[in-house]
Each structure stands twice: as structure tokens, then as C-alpha cells.
């Protein structure tokens, strides 16, 4: 990373202030070229910026000089706190582009440099990406916990414990080499396992499993997925509109009005939801397009965190958490359900307040607690592999095979925080960031 990058890291102009970040070995020279001198490190300094090509006055503003490695990226950095007009920012960016060795940053490149220089690890970078995309308070607090290293600190402790277990085992193996214990002597080799070896492995695996048993990050990021299902004209779309507080779905007395999935994200009391309205389920009378919609409705139900079933009692999709809903409490002629969780009317509002409260409480119980770190799919997979390796090591009688399982465990922990990884995976992650971050 020998080149120097720059980008607007604040919001798009016009704005009160526009902040341009510069990072790389040429950051100091770039700042000097525009400001005429290099200010004192880490002190906000008022400076007049001029275009190095012709001396044109660009702006009078605050600048910061941040020499590395104790910076966000681990490199020399500079910040220009400009007046946030489009023309001002465009002129300063053009001046920076004219300097040799400087180029515009790609999405996420500042954070990628921070990762490459050891300022953050992969788990913290993933938390930062989630923090930037957070839209609800619950998402923000969970992402912040990850970005501030909640998982990374645990991984460091687990790795230290695992290294201690491994060191005791390796010492026993070294001792066996000196005493020339035969490879085929199973009893003697089993006796080489350190005292409490299996118990130590299981204890560490249990610590990992407490994290594996936590609610996952995906439902929080994507929204707790609630699918409304039932036959045509059961009141699904009316209830859907009431939940999202928007006339998102067309409602009519004609059966089959909804023919495809209609998805809408909404936050209820700070809890993220994804509500899905579906085509009415029926076996007869549906045209070709409606049949496609019905197939999609059944597929959506299989992916739901919760199904709101508005059809005949007991006939809802099996295999997922399901609430029986009688959605026409305002209609005296509508049938009631004996085991119904809720009788309500989205038209009159009857029962809706209690229903919303129950829905929010149910989602909260399935999502990470406020401020609690949560594993994503990648992290969960690696941590599961580590726990399995520890359990295999505990069950192993051959110390050589036990040592190999411990090595696999260490490798999994390293992958968890990005000490090992592939460029493709890193490209995907940092591509989620905006330019200037």
C-alpha cells in the first residue's frame, strides 16, 4: 500500500462541513502542498488552502495532521474540514488529484487499510459495516458491541486458553520423544495426555457454546421475518397494511388480489421487522400467475421466523412458529378460533395494540439483547468448527491426534478474527462500505 488515498468521508454536499480524509505515505506532503506548511500533530489548525498548480485560493478552514502509526488506518493521515459546498469540495478534490501518488479511495479502502495494519480485526470490521447500515436502535447497539471488540476480546481469551492447553500437550509429546514411547503402544501414549486435558477442552468448548447458543445476527440485520399466510380474502393484506402503517398492499373483495410476495421493512418500538404479505392459498380456481404466487407463498412460509396464520384453525404450515389469527373481529359473521392467539380487526383497531405488543415481545426474545454482540453466519461457522475440534480433542486417546485437533481449533479462531482468510472474502466485506470509510 504505497499509494496515498483521499475521499470525502462526510455526507454528500451541500452540507455545513465537508470532511476529506487522506491516508498513506504522502498524506503529510499533500497537506503541506495545499496548506503551505505541516501543522503541529493532532491539533486542529486554521489554514488557508491553495491549489498547488496555480496558487488559486480554495478555502480557509480547519486541518488536522495525524502522523502514523497511531491513527485510524495505521498510516500517516490528514483531514480537511472544509465548508461543505459542492464547488469547494470539488475544487479541493481536483487539487488533490493533481498531486503525484494520490488517488481517490475505493469503497471501504480506509477500513481495509486499518485491518491490514492491525488497527482492527475482521470481526470488528464486520461490526463496523453493520454499524454503518444500522437503522434501528437495537441494530446500532449490537453492531457497536461488535465494532468495539466484544467478540474479539473473547477470541483473545479463548486463544490464550487454547494455547496453554496445546503447550501442555506439546510438552508431553516432546517428553515422549525423549523416552522413545512406541507409536503402537496405545496405553502408554494415552498416558501422555496431561492431567485434566479432556476436562479443560470441554470447559473451553462450553464457553464457546454459550456464544453459539445466542440469537444470531442475521434476523437482527434483515429484520425479524413475519409471513402472513392464509386463504384468499382472509384479511392478510389489510393486516399487513396496518402493521407497516402504509397502504402497501391492494385490498379488495375479489379473491386473488395479491398474486406475489409483498415485502416491507418496518421498525416497531425499535425492533426491526420484515413483513411479508402472500398470495391466498387455495387448491382450486387459481390461474397460472396466481399458482406461481401460491408456490412462492409456501416457500416464504418455510423461511419465516413467525407465521401469522389467518386460515382455518389447525391447517397452517407446519414446521415453523405459527400464531393462529382471527383477523375479522369487527365482522359478526366471521368464525372464531378456539385456540386462537389473537382476535383482532385491522379495520377498527380492536385487539391491535395487544397484538403489536405481543409481536414485539416475541421478536425481542428471538433477537440479541440490546448491546449484546451477535454472531453472523461466517463467525458462527468458524466458532462451531472450533468447538467441534475441542470436543474431538477431549474424546481422543492418541495425543498426536488430540494435538492436531487443537491445531484445527487455533486455526478456526484465527479465521474468526481474520488472521487467516481469503482475498475474495475481504473484497466482499469491504465492498459493503461507502467511499471515505
From Swiss-Prot:
- What Pfam families does the entry give? MMR_HSR1, MnmE_helical, TrmE_N
The record's Gene3D superfamilies line, in alphabetical order, gives: P-loop containing nucleotide triphosphate hydrolases (3.40.50.300), Probable tRNA modification gtpase trme, domain 1 (3.30.1360.120), tRNA modification GTPase MnmE domain 2 (1.20.120.430)
Q: One MF term in GO for this entry? A: metal ion binding
EC number per UniProt: 3.6.-.-
Annotated (6S)-5-formyl-5,6,7,8-tetrahydrofolate binding lies at 21, 79, 119, 437
> Where in or outside the cell is it found?
Cytoplasm
Q: How is the cofactor bound?
A: Binds 1 potassium ion per subunit.
SUPFAM superfamilies, sorted: Folate-binding domain (SSF103025), P-loop containing nucleoside triphosphate hydrolases (SSF52540), TrmE connector domain (SSF116878)
List the InterPro entries: G_TrmE, GTP-bd, GTP-bd_TrmE_N, GTPase_MnmE, MnmE_dom2, MnmE_helical, P-loop_NTPase, Small_GTP-bd
* Positions of GTP binding: 233-238, 252-258, 277-280
Q: Which family does it belong to?
A: Belongs to the TRAFAC class TrmE-Era-EngA-EngB-Septin-like GTPase superfamily. TrmE GTPase family.
Q: What does this protein do?
A: Exhibits a very high intrinsic GTPase hydrolysis rate. Involved in the addition of a carboxymethylaminomethyl (cmnm) group at the wobble position (U34) of certain tRNAs, forming tRNA-cmnm(5)s(2)U34.
Name the NCBIfam families on file: PRK05291.1-3, small_GTP
Q: Write down what this protein is called.
A: tRNA modification GTPase MnmE
Q: Which gene encodes it?
A: mnmE
